[in-house]
Design a protein with these regions (language model features):
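Charged, low-complexity intrinsically disordered regions
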Residues: 1-68, 249
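ASCE P-loop NTPase motor core, strongest for the SF2 helicase catalytic module
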Residues: 53-279, 283-466
Length: 466
């Protein structure tokens, strides 16, 4: 029986098979390449989908391995070291087992649990196991604001773990940073990692990034410098693996498992097609799922004894002065919008949103004045009502603001309400001062309030007293 074939199509298929064989090293395809082929084989082999339609299916071993990583409760159990001084919750033990399994397989891993589920304690448990059983050296990079919290957690949960802080806040004024040889864990900041060239000269066994969204932009000097630091295993800790765009995800995976999502050009081309191709999202999700462990506080299967978060929206009206400025700004914008277009028009809208926020905070912030009379702002008057109740109960309150210039006026206002001064924390607060504030605010002495800028106070603070 004869079957008619398309000669050009057969030729394309054979060429595709040859390209797959070329990917194999030592007669075996790497696990990373096998998973990349599943995500976007046409892009990886540089073959148009119009030219040849190729599908990829997993063998049983790869399928089982991926399913196991996606469901960490099924992983082989590894004992926690006796030198680790904490009792992990069940889901935290799963996270610990998952990190261990990823290290055995040689993969980078993203621990992306919701804020408050204990990413730090899981990581310390894993690092303590590595210190005792395999040794080596680990480098932890984090925002400067988190140094104090990590120090306290290490000394509490793994007191035998030798570590060194590689940061100017840990030195006397005349000292320079010297990397000591007899440590297991070295802790530095994103800013210092950019300056400490010697970090690239050490072959680290573990490279961990806390608040790893700091490398979401692949084009920055900071991101490029961190990706150049050599390490056998890379770990990212973040509650927000994707903040705004899918390119955030590519940069994260370029750090964790370089090449898994292709080049930035390949990934960009892939994501452009997702709008019209729902299957593409499913492929991408399946591709990254084994490398990201994310649990949410709202999932009762994860943590059942955590009370539900209670949100109460307090609505307020603008003062007469705020209303007048608001209307005035609207008229100004209307006039300018008719005269602008394109990127200039977009820029005008964005800058106007910021001005509206300032007016809603207090007219004096928008006008650049320093008086800040409470009666001129509906928000200030609403805040007074809330804080007077807190004062009567002798409780404590955290006030967050997007604007650093609002922290001092808010503190002055709260000082008047509570008849007692609280704390102000913003980007200019030193690491040492920040740690002292956190310790004192959580202590027995009554500190009624803390005003925090969002950027400086949005991550890494354990303020349980409020």
């Amino acid at each position: 029986k004869w079957v008619e074939i398309n000669k050009d199509r057969i030729k394309a298929i054979l060429q595709a098979l040859d390209k797959v064989k070329d990917l194999a090293k030592d007669e075996a395809l790497s696990l990373g390449d096998a998973m990349r082929l599943e995500l976007n084989i046409n892009e990886m082999l540089n073959i148009s989908s119009d030219e040849i339609d190729i599908s990829v299916s997993n063998g049983q071993w790869l399928k089982t391995m991926k399913e196991t990583l996606i469901n960490p409760t099924a992983l082989q159990k590894v004992d926690i070291e006796p030198s680790f001084n904490a009792t992990l919750r069940l889901y935290q033990k799963d996270g610990y087992q998952w990190l261990y399994q990823m290290s055995k397989l040689g993969f980078g891993a993203c621990l992306a649990d919701d804020m408050g589920l204990g990413k730090t304690v899981q990581m310390i448990a894993f690092l303590e196991y590595c210190r005792v059983n395999t040794g080596g050296q680990a480098l932890l990079i984090l925002p400067a604001s988190l140094i104090g919290n990590w120090q306290k957690e290490i000394e509490r949960f793994a007191p035998e773990m030798p570590y060194q802080i590689l940061h100017k806040s840990d030195l006397k004024s005349s000292e320079t940073i010297q990397i000591k040889e007899n440590r297991f864990l070295y802790i530095t900041t994103y800013g210092m990692a950019l300056r400490l060239e010697e970090l690239k000269d050490i072959k680290w066994d573990y490279l961990i990034l806390d608040e790893a969204q700091a490398i979401k932009n692949p084009g920055t000097k900071q991101t490029k410098a961190i990706k150049q630091i050599p390490a056998k295993m890379r770990i990212a800790m973040t509650g927000t693996p994707i903040e705004n765009r899918l390119s955030d995800l590519w940069s994260l995976f370029d750090f964790l498992n370089q090449g898994l999502l292709g080049t930035t050009k390949e990934f960009t081309n892939f994501t452009k097609e997702l709008t019209n191709n729902a299957v593409g999202y499913s492929k991408l999700r399946k591709m990254i799922q084994p490398f990201i462990l994310r649990r949410l506080k709202t999932d009762k299967k994860i943590i059942s004894d955590l009370p539900d978060k209670l949100e109460m929206n307090a609505y307020t009206t603008l003062s007469k002065k705020q209303i007048a400025l608001y209307k005035q700004l609207i008229e100004q914008i209307k006039e300018k919008l008719t005269e602008s277009e394109g990127i200039e028009r977009k820029g005008l809208i964005l800058s106007s949103i910021m001005k509206f926020k300032q007016i809603c905070n207090h007219p004096d912030q928008y006008l650049g004045r320093e008086e800040y009379k409470p009666e001129h702002s509906g928000k200030f008057e609403q805040l007074r009502e809330i804080c007077e109740t807190i004062r009567e109960k002798r409780e404590r309150v955290l006030i967050f603001t997007q604007f650093r210039e609002m922290t001092e006026p808010l503190s002055d206002f709260l000082k008047e309400i509570f008849s007692k001064e609280g704390f102000v924390l913003h980007g200019g607060t030193t690491v040492k001062k920040r740690n002292e504030m956190v310790k004192e605010f959580n202590g027995e002495r009554y500190i009624p309030y803390m005003v925090l800028s969002l950027k400086a106070g949005g991550v890494g603070l354990n303020l349980t007293a409020a």
